[in-house]
Amino acid sequence: MPDEPQPGPDDDFQEMLRKLLSGEGQIDPSQLAGAAGLPNDPAFVANLMSQLQRAAQSGGDGIDFSIASERATAIAREGGHPVDPATSQAADQAFQVAALWLDEATSVTELTATPSLYTREQWAKATTPVWAQIAEPVALSISNALTEAIEQRAPEQLKAMLGDVSKAMRGVGGALFAIQLGQVVGQLSKEVVSGGDVGVPLLDEQVAALLPQNVSEFAEGLDVPEDEVRIYLAVRELAHARLFRSARWLRLHIISSITDYARGIHIPFDRVEELASEIDPTNQEQLRDALASGALIPPRTEEQEAALARLETMLALVEGWVDTVTAAATARLPKSGAIAEMVRRRRAAGGPAESAFATLVGLELRPRRLREAAAMWQRVTDELGTEQRDALWSHFDAVPTSEDIDAPDAFVARLRNPGASAEDDEFDRALEDLLNDATGDRPREDESGHVDENPGDGADDDSEGPEDPDTRPR
């Protein structure tokens, strides 16, 4: 009847927790799978329930990311197929050609390890550990927020029944996040074409890899022979892998920058409450969107905005260098320009990893200054050559800055004259401003030879009205 009291969201939530954590296993598996965006496969859901119950009962401080690896590889297997001998031979030949061409375009030495060909499942399994490292700080923050929510809202009798609810919820929250991580990585395995496609080094720094199935699907959208696409992508991948092998500090720097950013994310209890009030717990689509969108992650702080800007600059420098080297190395390919444009459009649309980072750590990892960075690298190449350009990756302190991207000519001048001091740079900038007469204050000589030291008051002044007298001291 309409007048009968209906159980509220809190009642439903408490009942679900009670059944889950007490091991009764009476939760509707199809509803749980639908809310998490998971397939309603009985075997999978049974395994999921078992994992969540184990996580609740273990209550450890860490998070078991083996769940993420299992889920990622399961998704990657859907529609995936192994690399056949003909495709393997074609890819090997592409890597051989790419290595020869790349030797002419960069002084960065070749890899010692043989390039690999990954299936989607192999890529998912190989990269999940790094994804887990990146996402773990946020997973812990979400687990802690859920723990706080339960401690503040659960009735005393429920707390007593659950025992150490904090540890239980920390385990369950971590397991749920690990499942979501597996979802993201598994879906990503169907989109990436190479090991460096994400922009962040997810594989060992000495490994270059292509995903032949995804390369073929990428080539389907182009009016370009697949062999050319394969060679072009092999060049990009080798350039990316060579850079990270040569600049051994670079991989650790980028991964550490992301994890340090993620550690600054603290999800407050009121954010959990706010999100709970906005979502209808019976609406599986809303619940799934909340899990997949990273809605729990709060807005960035000023410190995080600054850290993100630095990280985006470094990613732009990496991708800009790869673009510059790839363009030079693939000049022989008739359709290299068309392939490069497709790569740029794909990246401008967000790329295969942007939504993944946004979901997992609230990062919009897009090298926004890529074109400017590539132009800067090209300027350095034209003026100083490939060896001096590539030597800039030898140490973090030698890498160009955001200011160098803005002023490549000044950067090149400084590289030509490394002994110049900061005062010299300041003097050069002031002299350049004066010669360019950016302010209009440079003294001018008229036709009679008279020097006007106040040109702003002269006849060239386009402003209307009487001119102000010169009151400056002589």
In which residue ranges do the predicted regions lie?
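Pan-zinc metallopeptidase signature
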Residues: 299-474
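Short pre-active-site segment immediately N-terminal to the catalytic Zn-binding motif
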Residues: 173-176, 215-233
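Post-HExxH zinc-binding segment in Zn-dependent metallohydrolases
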Residues: 175-196, 244-296, 306-333
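Auxiliary, metal-adjacent structural segments of Zn-dependent hydrolase domains
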Residues: 91-213
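A short mid-domain helix/strand-loop element embedded in enzyme catalytic domains
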Residues: 201-216, 284-301
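Long amphipathic alpha-helical segments used for membrane anchoring, targeting, substrate engagement
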Residues: 1-65, 154-172, 417, 422-446, ...
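Active-site recognition of the HExxH zinc-binding catalytic motif
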Residues: 228-248, 377
